[in-house]
Swiss-Prot record:
Protein name per its UniProtKB record: Small ribosomal subunit protein bS20
Protein function: Binds directly to 16S ribosomal RNA.
HAMAP family, alphabetized: Ribosomal_bS20
GO term, biological process aspect, one: translation
Gene that specifies this protein: rpsT
One Gene Ontology MF term: small ribosomal subunit rRNA binding
Amino acid sequence: MANIKSAKKRALQSERRRQHNASRRSMTRTSLKKVLAAIASGDKASAQAAFAAATPLIDRMATKGLIHKNKAARHKSRLSAQIKALA
């Protein structure tokens, strides 16, 4: 454990950030799984609805630095292509 006051504060802040980021990461993964489940079921309408809900979440995570912007773009591109292939 840190002895210096500023180091203690940094430890508390980083733990708070870690928990917050874990929550956001979990939320993002859940939304991606919902889209993939809808694609797997073959229901294009529900897949599009889930994708529409997941897209702003993915973008927000990229903006906040939780995931890289290229990773966000890759996720959206691949999911979109899979939904298009359902037709």
